[in-house]
């Protein structure tokens, strides 16, 4: 059995045909050369292009990631600045409201004080007129009483009645 196996390995009973082996090797080498020239080059170019595309896509993705992170940081900064600006506006509004409140209160106090002074002035003026009127009436009454007294002597009771009468007359005027 081993002998039959050797025959199949070495070729049919005639041995190895070196001419056929050389032709097959040369055909294989020519086939490899043709494959290298016509198939391997374009296939390698396709593979290289694909590798460049993948690398470019990876670079683009990394750049997009960096851009997204940068944009996120910018947005955070803008949000922070906006919040600070809103806070400042609110604080300014509070300060302005307090100032307006103080100004309104001050103006109201000035007006009230002016009104009080005007009222005091009016009261004093009316008081002075009333005192002047009373003084005039007292003077008139005194003159009247004196003229009556000079005409006749009056008792204390009559004098009191006379003063009351003139005061009543003066009050009716």
Swiss-Prot record:
Which terms in the Gene Ontology molecular function aspect does this entry carry? proton-transporting ATP synthase activity, rotational mechanism; proton-transporting ATPase activity, rotational mechanism
Q: Which CDD domains does the record associate with it?
A: ATP-synt_Fo_b
Q: Where does it primarily localize? A: membrane
Instruction: Quote the function comment for this protein.
Output: F(1)F(0) ATP synthase produces ATP from ADP in the presence of a proton or sodium gradient. F-type ATPases consist of two structural domains, F(1) containing the extramembraneous catalytic core and F(0) containing the membrane proton channel, linked together by a central stalk and a peripheral stalk. During catalysis, ATP synthesis in the catalytic domain of F(1) is coupled via a rotary mechanism of the central stalk subunits to proton translocation. Component of the F(0) channel, it forms part of the peripheral stalk, linking F(1) to F(0).
InterPro entries on file: ATP_synth_B-like_membr_sf (IPR028987), ATP_synth_b/b'su_bac/chlpt (IPR002146), ATP_synth_F0_bsu_bac (IPR005864), ATP_synthase_B_chain (IPR050059)
Question: In the UniProt record, does the keyword Cell membrane occur?
Answer: yes
Q: Which residues are listed as membrane-spanning?
A: 15-35
> Quaternary state and partners of this protein?
F-type ATPases have 2 components, F(1) - the catalytic core - and F(0) - the membrane proton channel. F(1) has five subunits: alpha(3), beta(3), gamma(1), delta(1), epsilon(1). F(0) has three main subunits: a(1), b(2) and c(10-14). The alpha and beta chains form an alternating ring which encloses part of the gamma chain. F(1) is attached to F(0) by a central stalk formed by the gamma and epsilon chains, while a peripheral stalk is formed by the delta and b chains.
An annotated GO cellular component of this protein is:
proton-transporting ATP synthase complex
| NCBIfam families assigned to the protein according to its UniProt record, in alphabetical order | ATP_synt_b (TIGR01144), PRK13453.1 (NF009987)
Q: Which organism is it from?
A: Staphylococcus aureus (strain N315)
Its annotated compartments are: Cell membrane; Membrane raft
Q: Which SUPFAM superfamilies match?
A: F1F0 ATP synthase subunit B, membrane domain (SSF81573)
Annotated protein name in UniProt: ATP synthase subunit b
- Look up the signal peptide feature and give its range: none
User: Which family does the entry's similarity section mention?
Assistant: Belongs to the ATPase B chain family.
PANTHER family listed in its UniProt record: ATP SYNTHASE SUBUNIT B, ATP SYNTHASE SUBUNIT B', CHLOROPLASTIC
The protein's UniProt keywords, in alphabetical order, are: ATP synthesis, Cell membrane, CF(0), Hydrogen ion transport, Ion transport, Membrane, Transmembrane, Transmembrane helix, Transport
Q: Which gene name does the record give?
A: atpF
The domain of life is Bacteria
